[in-house]
């Protein structure tokens, strides 16, 4: 065992003597790569990140504005919907009122027309009754005037004897009771 340890110490010392590439000790390439990395990081941090952050902030602001606009539009839509419903309810009430008024006016017109027609019928009936009474009175007067001569003619035909009209008038008046 001891031989193995001394062998490894010997190998290390030989490596150090040859040029010393010890992996535990950083060499110049590492520092050069580190410097390039830091320079690239600084360039990206200075020139790339701020515009990207600006675009991201603008996009966040745009999203927030869009969300606010959507909420506002939804509220306006609900308000418009409520106004529409209210207007429709009012219009339905008004239409119902107009329909009821039209029905009432229609009934009134029908009743007025019916009353006017009944009045015209009554006046026509009264006119006809007066005309019939006048005609009846005229016919009655005519018959009263001619009853004596008609009675005499009828009696002459029935009896076969010539009867005088004056006698027929007296007998007709006594018979009728007037």
UniProtKB/Swiss-Prot annotation:
Location relative to the cell: Cell membrane
TM segment ranges: 30-50
A GO term for molecular function: proton-transporting ATP synthase activity, rotational mechanism
Alphabetical keyword list: ATP synthesis, Cell membrane, CF(0), Hydrogen ion transport, Ion transport, Membrane, Transmembrane, Transmembrane helix, Transport
The record's section on SUPFAM superfamilies has: F1F0 ATP synthase subunit B, membrane domain (SSF81573)
Any one Gene Ontology cellular component term annotated for this protein: plasma membrane
The principal location of this protein is membrane
**How is the protein disposed in the membrane?**
Single-pass membrane protein
Q: Which InterPro entries match?
A: ATP_synth_B-like_membr_sf (IPR028987), ATP_synth_b/b'su_bac/chlpt (IPR002146), ATP_synthase_B_chain (IPR050059)
- Pfam family of the protein (one): ATP-synt_B
Q: Does the keyword Ion transport apply?
A: yes
Subunit structure comment from the entry: F-type ATPases have 2 components, F(1) - the catalytic core - and F(0) - the membrane proton channel. F(1) has five subunits: alpha(3), beta(3), gamma(1), delta(1), epsilon(1). F(0) has three main subunits: a(1), b(2) and c(10-14). The alpha and beta chains form an alternating ring which encloses part of the gamma chain. F(1) is attached to F(0) by a central stalk formed by the gamma and epsilon chains, while a peripheral stalk is formed by the delta and b chains.
What is the protein's known function? F(1)F(0) ATP synthase produces ATP from ADP in the presence of a proton or sodium gradient. F-type ATPases consist of two structural domains, F(1) containing the extramembraneous catalytic core and F(0) containing the membrane proton channel, linked together by a central stalk and a peripheral stalk. During catalysis, ATP synthesis in the catalytic domain of F(1) is coupled via a rotary mechanism of the central stalk subunits to proton translocation.
Record-stated family: Belongs to the ATPase B chain family.
Q: Which HAMAP family match?
A: ATP_synth_b_bprime
List the protein's name. ATP synthase subunit b
């Amino acid at each position: 065992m001891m031989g193995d340890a001394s062998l490894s110490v010997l190998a290390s010392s030989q490596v150090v003597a040859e040029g010393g590439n010890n992996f535990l000790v950083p060499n110049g390439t590492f520092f050069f790569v580190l410097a390039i990395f830091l320079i690239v990081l600084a360039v990206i941090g200075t020139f790339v990140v701020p515009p990207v952050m600006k675009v991201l902030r603008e996009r966040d602001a745009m999203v927030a504005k869009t969300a606010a606009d959507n909420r506002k539009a939804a509220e306006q839509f609900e308000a418009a919907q409520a106004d529409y419903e209210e207007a429709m309810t009012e219009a339905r009430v008004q239409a119902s009122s107009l329909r009821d008024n039209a029905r009432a006016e229609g009934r009134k017109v029908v009743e007025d027309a019916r009353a006017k027609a009944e009045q015209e019928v009554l006046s026509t009936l009264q006119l006809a009754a007066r005309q019939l009474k006048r005609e009846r009175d005229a016919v009655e007067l005519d018959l009263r005037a001619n009853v004596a001569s008609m009675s005499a003619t009828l009696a002459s035909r029935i009896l076969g004897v010539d009867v005088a009209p004056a006698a027929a008038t007296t007998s007709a008046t006594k018979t009728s009771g007037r």
